[in-house]
Amino acid sequence: MHARKILQSAAVLALSAALTLPAGPAQAAAGPNTDFNGDGYNDLAVGSPSYPGYPGTKNSGLVAVLFGGPDGLTYNRHIIRPAPGCTAGGLPCEAWGVNLSAADVDADGRTDLISRGHYDLQVDSWTSQGTATIERRVYGHRTAPWRLMSGQFDDQPGTDIVGPTRGGYWFSVGGWYNRSANLLFTDFADDSYLTKETSAASGDLDGDGKLEIAVVAGRHSGAGELGPHLWLIDDPHRPQVQLTTLGSPSTCTSPPSYGQGCPKADSEVAMGNVNGDGHDDLVMLTPSTASLQVWYGRATGPSSAPGYTVDLSSLATSAELGPGLAVGDVNGDGWAEIVIGASKATVSGHSEAGAVMVIPGSATGPVIKRAQLVTQDGIGPVGGTALADPIAEQSKPGDRFGQAITITDLTGDGKGEVIVGAPAKNGGSGMLAVLFGSATGVLTSTAQAIHPSRYGLNSTQAYFGGVLLK
């Protein structure tokens, strides 16, 4: 028999008005191209920065590339890990897989994997001849992009590898532009001294073909008020980087009100096309206020205020929410779903077993009343009883199901799979759950439960599923 399911208050139905779903979204958003081996199916990269190294080495970490197919993740995999004796700047290589990104770095028409450790970064490329590391960069621990992002960020040809970088007491944005060998950071236009970067995401909000960066960070000094801010950065390569403020302490009310951005130190951001208009939208989850906010993209850039705000406290407590957050089209209708993790949620009496909520998108934004609640014990409507249990596992205390989430179309059917990490499961070895996309949302008849032992990874220090490529 199945364990008792989470029951959520029916009051969630009052969180949003009834929304109609007009046809004709401008653009689907099933997820990025992560087909590394060129077989027509997207693949998944999983970072395991705490994985033990070879005998006599530190916990040097690794990256497992798991290949997709018509039935989901296959048994085929490629493991990237430091070789014995690997050093970076005179220090042992460690924490490989702490951050991941993907882009066509060498302009050969095929997606490459970018992964970093504490002191180094490398780009791996797949060709018909096999896999090769085409770039390797060594840097100091305090000059590494904390969140890897890759793609076209400036107006010059070539792939950029950039991200927010956290130093001892400072924060900046920069990296390698257009395959340059030089690491470049530019100053902020208002001479701000920023610190405590907590989350970042990239996407094309204005539809100009270049990516923007959204980042949650604290302002320590400089022009403006102190405290957590949500900033939008357009072209971080430009001298004197411009910061567009979308939220700050002065825009916060309690509880968060419609039309006001309210970033906190625990806010998480992601991007995707929620309303199907061809522009990415900026989504922010703030666990401490149990709120979800969306800034809609448009040709002139997003409005300074969110176009959608909702109180999530009827779905989960603030202590349960986060940090998992992903945006992508699960049902193939052209409107991206928002998937929220509640990794510390109590499920079937088990503390911190974890759950995720899949919130459909529409032409008018998220549709909270049609959300699905997913645990290892079942799937069903929020506020109701689970109707099916496709995951061949049960919730256990401390699993942290929903700690990390990504949405990728592994099967090639135009519908994104929701891939959920439970990194603390089975004593820390971890697990992935692949929830298949379907026309009605997450498929309730079948799912994949992926254990690292399937790929020869048997350490209880793997925390498999804690870092996922987005």
Tell where the protein language model's regions lie, with residue ranges:
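Bacterial N-terminal signal peptides that target proteins for export
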Residues: 1-11
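Blade-edge motifs of beta-propeller repeat domains
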Residues: 13, 17-30, 67-95, 123-147, ...
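An edge-strand/N-cap motif at the start of beta-rich repeat modules
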Residues: 27-79, 86, 100, 162, ...
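Beta-propeller blade termini
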Residues: 29-41, 97-105, 146-154, 159, ...
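Hydrophobic strand positions within the blades of repeat-based beta-sheet folds
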Residues: 44-46, 63-66, 96, 113, ...
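Short glycine/acidic-enriched loop and turn motifs that connect beta-strands
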Residues: 50-55, 120-121, 167-169, 219-224, ...
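A detector of repeated loop/turn-to-beta-strand junctions in beta-rich toroidal repeat architectures
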Residues: 57-62, 120, 225-229, 289-291, ...
